[in-house]
Amino acid sequence: MATVTTLAYKDVKTVMTKSSLPVGGYSVNPYVGCPHACRYCYASFMKRFTGHTEKWGTFLDVKNWPRITDPHKYDGQRIVIGSVTDGYNEHEATYRRTRMLLEQLRGTSAEIMVTTKSDLVLRAIDVLKTLPKETVSRSVNTPDEAFKDDMDDAPSIERRLSAMKTFHDEGIRTVCFVSPIFPGITDVPAIIDRAKDQADLIWLENLNLRGQFKGDIMRYIADKYPQLVPLYEEIYNKGKRDYWQALEAQVKQICSENDFPYLRNDLPYGRSKPGKPVIVNYFYHEEIRLNNK
């Protein structure tokens, strides 16, 4: 578990932020910072906007916002909770900001999606069941706990998968978010096979390396997986897509053989047929950006 050395309250005018993300009309983050401290996390770039100089993962601001008194304002929207934090990080057990947010949104017809790596979200089953369109998305990019521990301080993969099954069994729409896919490391077919009976959708997103964490990840690969250095050089320094195109073809074959619906850069709503999750490919981020302009 990450050690948060700086914890403070932060007053904000609103917790609801219009989103530029493809998946959300509103992006909602009850906390600033994230104790999971994922080494590959794109959200770490947010630190420059927070006033914090501490290392990403070691600070957390607990947001205070005016109560949402008109949840119907968000009817027909999609609300994503946890785009640059985990609303169910371990401190949620104390501060309950995400719980409070969900309770304030009761009555809206909005589609509400909670993204998390934590099984603390199990505490929210009761309130989620009061919402008409609820989804819980959980990130799983490896069955290897040692690799997971190298990458983040979040709960174990087994705990995540167990929580996913509980939500699915409770009738709550579930997403297994296979992200980020590390070339040569993430076993996508194995994760699809493990999640197929407990997820309505399986999202696939490739590892994108940018900013300060690119160097860190490349050094990690050189140290722990030196045989993969040429592959990572091809993808991340030369811009080659061959690996992703081959993986896409493999996933399409799996879908064809198992009668899994396959989509690209889409976000359908609804429950899947038992054992037939919808597989959604998000490998091509530039296409998503162009389609959402």
Regions found by a protein language model. Give the residues of each.
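Conserved Radical SAM active-site core
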Residues: 1-135, 143-146, 157-158, 169
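Auxiliary Fe-S-binding modules of radical SAM enzymes
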Residues: 2-11, 189-293
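Generic structural signal for well-ordered alpha-helices
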Residues: 66, 99-102, 125, 160-164, ...
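Structural preference for beta-strand elements that scaffold enzyme active sites
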Residues: 78-80, 111-113, 135-137, 173-177, ...
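Active-site beta-loop-alpha junctions enriched in small/polar residues
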Residues: 84-86, 117-119, 139-143, 179-181, ...
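Surface-exposed amphipathic alpha-helices with a cationic face
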Residues: 106, 129, 162-171, 252-258
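Short acidic, glycine/proline-rich loop/turn micro-motifs
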Residues: 147-151
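Conserved strand-turn element in the central/C-terminal portion of the radical SAM core barrel
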Residues: 153, 165-186, 237-241
